[in-house]
């Protein structure tokens, strides 16, 4: 980002061939760019709402600025699911069928009830309270800042309350994502029931290619979980001042 920021600052004075035409952003820092004049409104490229009728709304929300102007497009969304340990599901719930398992995690209150069942049989429901934060936070209905005041959404407070209750009950831990303790549940002896993530998590980050892991022999199932969410994705933004606007438009529509 540092190189991109420095180059964008010089965009107006750069020779035509040295100007940035487009750049990519991720959801976690998209607003840093789309809420500035360094990115072009999509409509200024000649892309109409009808061209975007099949895009999921959240992929547009991520790159919509504070004035409601769409400033980017995505070809790669990463919707998430609940990945569950099939053997743990059979042991505690009596089934590893995705539709049946979904009944035990269909909302947060039911999820919490199931956590107690898991704990009684020696399993953690999730590896860490940090596993669920993204799911709760993707489903807020208000902004973090309201005028000059910090606002804490009700769904964030529910995450706080639910997380504390699970930790107090010994149903989960507080380790950081990507830590060694967090990844112990990738193996049977870690005794973790579920993780939340998109396809890239189970394919590339849960030791699926390591013999002895749960994923190595297809031991993870997938259910919708308590709430829909996403984690990751890539968005294309057009840089203000590009001299190749038509090409940027074509790339966006093609992707």
Where are these regions (language model features)?
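Solvent-exposed loop/turn segments at secondary-structure junctions
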Residues: 2, 27-32, 78-81, 88-89, ...
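Structural recognition of the beta-strand scaffold that forms the well-ordered cores
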Residues: 21-25, 72-75, 81-83, 125-128, ...
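Periplasmic-binding protein-like
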Residues: 86-88, 252-255
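Extracytoplasmic/periplasmic substrate-binding proteins
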Residues: 158-250
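Extracellular/periplasmic catalytic domains that process cell-envelope and extracellular macromolecules
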Residues: 14-18, 33-35, 63-67, 74-76, ...
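Helix-loop-helix "hinge/cap" segment bordering the ligand-binding cleft or interdomain interface
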Residues: 43-53, 61-132, 144-177, 240-246
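Short helix-initiation/N-cap motifs at beta->coil->alpha
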Residues: 1-10, 105-110, 174-188
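Extracytoplasmic "Venus flytrap"/periplasmic binding protein-like
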Residues: 1-55, 69, 91-92, 184-186, ...
């Amino acid at each position: 980002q540092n190189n991109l920021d420095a180059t964008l600052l010089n965009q107006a004075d750069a020779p035509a061939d040295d100007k940035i035409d487009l750049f990519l952003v991720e959801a976690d820092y998209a607003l840093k760019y789309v809420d500035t004049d360094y990115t072009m409104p999509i409509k200024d490229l000649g892309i109409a709402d009808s061209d975007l009728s099949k895009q999921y709304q959240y992929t547009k929300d991520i790159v919509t600025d504070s004035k409601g102007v769409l400033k980017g497009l995505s070809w790669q969304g990463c919707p998430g699911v609940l990945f569950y340990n099939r053997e743990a599901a059979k042991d505690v719930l009596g089934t590893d069928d995705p539709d049946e398992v979904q009944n035990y995690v269909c909302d947060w209150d039911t999820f919490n009830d199931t956590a107690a069942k898991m704990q009684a049989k020696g399993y953690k429901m999730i590896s860490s309270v940090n596993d669920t934060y993204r799911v709760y936070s993707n489903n807020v209905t208000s902004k973090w800042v309201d005028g000059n005041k910090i606002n804490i959404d009700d769904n964030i407070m529910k995450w706080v309350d639910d997380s504390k209750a699970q930790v107090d009950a010994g149903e989960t831990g507080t380790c950081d994502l990507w830590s060694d303790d967090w990844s112990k549940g990738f193996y049977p002896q870690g005794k973790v029931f579920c993780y939340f993530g998109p396809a890239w998590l189970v394919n590339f980050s849960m030791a699926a290619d390591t013999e002895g892991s749960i994923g190595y022999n297809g031991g993870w199932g997938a259910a919708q979980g308590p709430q829909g969410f996403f984690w990751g994705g890539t968005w294309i933004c057009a840089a203000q001042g590009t001299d190749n606007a038509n090409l940027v438009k074509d790339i966006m529509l093609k992707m």
